Structures are given as C-alpha cells and as structure tokens.
Amino acid sequence: MDYVPWIGNGYRYGKNHRGVDDITAPKTGAGSSSGTSTNTSGSRSFLPTFSNVGVGLKANVQATLGGSQTTTTGGSKWPTLDQANLLLWTGSGWRNDKNGQSDENHTTFKSATGSGQQGGSSGTSAGNPDSLKQDKISKSGDSLSVVDTGQGDDTHYANLPPSITPTSDWPNALSFTNKNNAQRVQLFLRGLLDSIPVLVNKSGQDDNSKFKAEHQKWKYSDFKSDQTKLNLPAYGEVNGLLNPALVETYFGTTRAGGSGNQNRTTVPGIGFKIPEQNNDSKAVLITPGLAWTPQDVGNLVVSGTTVSFQLGGWLVTFTDFVKPRSGYLGLQLTGLDVSEATQRELIWAPRPWAAFRGSWVNRLGRVESVWDFKGVWADQAHSAVSESQAATSGTTTATGAALPEHPNALAFQVSVVEASAYKPNTSSGQTQSTNSSPYLHLIQPKKVTQSDKLDDDLKNLLDPNEVRARMLQSFGTENSTQAQPQSLKTTTPVFGAMSGTSAVCLVVGVPRRAQAQVNLAWISPPLNGWVGH
C-alpha cells in the first residue's frame, strides 16, 4: 500500500542513516510483524526508517493491516480498515533535544512503534501512543548508548487539535476501492509538492507547547549571533522528528563546517533566507521544489473535491483538486493550533498562497506558473522606501506609488534555468566560494513599479484569450488550422518527470465556451485518471 506511512525497519534513525541494504534485511514484507522492507534487487533503500509524519499506527503493522483489524467487503482483495477498530493516531513523536543531541532522534523502533509492548492486537495499551516512551540516552564523549525505557517522556504530540485527527474519510482513503483513494492522491501530492514551496515548522521545546506562535519565527539577531541554536527545521525534520531521507534533501545553508568556520553547502535542496536587515523579520524558506514521499505527508483527509494533509506544522488544504476550476487551484495553509489567532500567521507572508494561480507545461516540458503578487505586496505598498532613499532624503514614510519586492514574497517555480542564475557566495576571511548548482535556482518576481501596471499584466495574463494563445504558442500550433494532435489530449495535463523531478502540471484551464475553438480535451478534467473523475 503506497500510502500507509512507513513504520520502520528495525534500525535506529539519525542524521547519518541513509537506509538499509534491503538485500541483507530480513525477508519480510511491510505486512509482517517486524515491519521490515523487502527488496530482492539488492539496491539501497532511502526510505525513512520510521514514519516522520503526524500519522502513525497504534498497533503493529501485522495487527493493523494483516487482517485482524481489517474487513473485506464485496469480494474485494483490498482490506478496509474497520471503523470500529480504527487504529490510527496523530503525532508520531518528537526528537530528543536533551544533552545537545538536537540533530538526532534516539527513540528505537521497538519503543516508537510499541512492538515490544504487544504480541498482537489485544490489550488496551497495545501501541497506544500515550504509552510510547522516549528512550534514555547516555553520552560519554562521542559515544552514545540508547537504552529502552518503559517510563519517560511521551513520544506523541499531546496537544494536537481535533482538526487534524483521523476522520470517517480514513477507511476510504486507505482502501483502493474509492476514486479518491490514497494511492492516486499520493501521486498527485508527490507531483504537486515537487513544484510549489512548502513551509515547515519549528518543533518547539521538549514539553507540551509545540505550536506556539513564537516557535514559527526567528529573529535576525539570533541568526546573526548563532545560527545553530535556533532549532531550524532545515535539517530534515517534520514535526520535530528527524527524517533521514529529508536530511539528504535539505540544503543546509546554516550548517558551518570545515576550516575557518567557512559555511559550506551540502546536498542542494532547501534552506532559509536570512532577513537582510537587522530586525525581527521572519526567515524565508527557499526551495526549488521538494521531493516529498508518502512517508513525509501526514493526516491525509479526502473530502469531496478537497484534500487536506499535514506537512510540518501546517495543515495544507487543496480545493477543487478533482475538478479544478478554470485557471485556479485553491490552496490554504493553516497553523495547527487553530485556536490561537497569531498561530495562523505564516512565516512567509499573511496570505502567500493567494499569489498562486496555477501551473502548466510549456512545449519544452517545463512547468510554468502564474503568481499574483498583488495580494502579497499590498500590505507593503504603503511602506516601500529603500534604505538608500531613507538615507539620502530622510524620508520615513512612503508615498505608496511603488511596489518593491516584498522581502518575504519571493517566487519559486520548478523550471530549468542557467546555473549562473543563482550563485550564492559564502566567504571566510580571504576565502570565497560559489555554489552554482542548478538545483539552487531562484526565480524572483519581476519588480513592479506601478500598481496599475501590475493589474494590467495580471489581467492580460489570466485573460482566457491570452491563456489560449499561450497554450497554442507553447505547442507551436498558433498558426495551425488543423485539429490538435491526439497526443495533446492524452499526455499534456498529466503528472510526470520534469527535468529529473516529479512535477505537477496543473493546467490553466480553458473555459468551456472556448473548448470548441481550442479543441483540447482538458475540461474532463485535467486530473482525469489520477484522482478520479
């Protein structure tokens, strides 16, 4: 089952762990009591060794999915979780921040899954997250020893709000008998999350206050003084639980190493852009697209044409994903602690996703996106004064005529650019180095000087006739009087590999009234065959 979060393979997980050689692993499948993976090819698996999402299983894999807690109906070969015994819980645990070991989670597979506490599915404490404890850690120099413990800190989030608890949609989502089944939705999510920026939260302290507003923000002064003590989630953690697979994805710009404390970049992925001014501005997450897997996305809830899931400290909601409206895919991010108004403030901008209008594929097979930055910049228009202007004229208030680039409103889209387009420099003393990896490309919005020009540009860009022209031009058919080739009807609005990544192609759709003119079968619908009709 592609969706069910990976429970583990019996190995402790940490920042240096990159999986297990499956050819040497016990030959048992995911439905076995050990929960180990099976791969006879001998290739190295880069799957996380534990589910680092806000979803887990109360019972072991065999008890939950092997039959004792499932039912089959209508002769279907796919088991459906029995609602009366729905053994799913939110919050897989947090990492151990004690003794300076903030970059590893030392909870063993036995303790994290509760497999050592249960021989089957019977018993009230079988895999109960409230009974799962964090292991004790002893450190002597560089040597660490992990000791199983029966008592200790809980390894789950005790204060997750009800808004992300499993719902009645879970049985359908975890079966393959529903159009909006989990496997199809995961294909959608994996493609989509590879082409849009994503926010990840700070895990907080080792107590029952995980999602306070102050944990979502980082001060520039703290960045400048000590970039290592902010507990940034840029080291591969989701919900405070380290994911070794994500460590390889993240771009550790804040990690110092080598001689002279020279900052070094490791595996290119994502990182944080430190505010340029010495103020309390929020850090900006930069990403060329994340390759999230089903193991990294939690609390998937499918309801009608809406899909919601938890990613880090945010609940991401996509509306109209089954039948997206013309040129629009609704996106919404909500802080997990929805009871606190300040918690809903994103670390980017008040309404970052209001800028997203959709994506499509050009004739080169690259994803292009439409971003409306007026909503993101609107709150900054009245205070747009550069430092140079303030220094020369002493002006402290803006005229409102200019719309400078919002420091927290950078645009990122999956596309291929020259490596020279983004070359962040790192220096130490007289030493300078340039990282020119094409994975680090950063596409910034064009600087708009007049608000009316922004309005006109967006109107032109989103006008149905302009969209039609762009589509025809992209495929080199703007001057053709022939019917569109069949390939356009079947291969264009799909998810596929784009430049080495799995990108989503959300077509800026053509209204029905223009369908006959364009003769493209995109209305029925773009996601047909992936997440249902």
UniProtKB/Swiss-Prot annotation:
Biased amino acid composition, Basic and acidic residues: 95-107
Disulfide feature: none
Domain of life: Bacteria
Residue ranges of the region described as Disordered: 15-45, 92-166
Biased composition, class Low complexity, residue ranges: 28-45
InterPro entries on file: Adhesin_P1_C (IPR004940)
Family, similarity comment: Belongs to the adhesin P1 family.
Record protein name field: Putative adhesin P1-like protein MPN_409
Natural source organism: Mycoplasma pneumoniae (strain ATCC 29342 / M129 / Subtype 1)
Lineage, highest ranks first: Bacteria, Bacillati, Mycoplasmatota, Mycoplasmoidales, Mycoplasmoidaceae
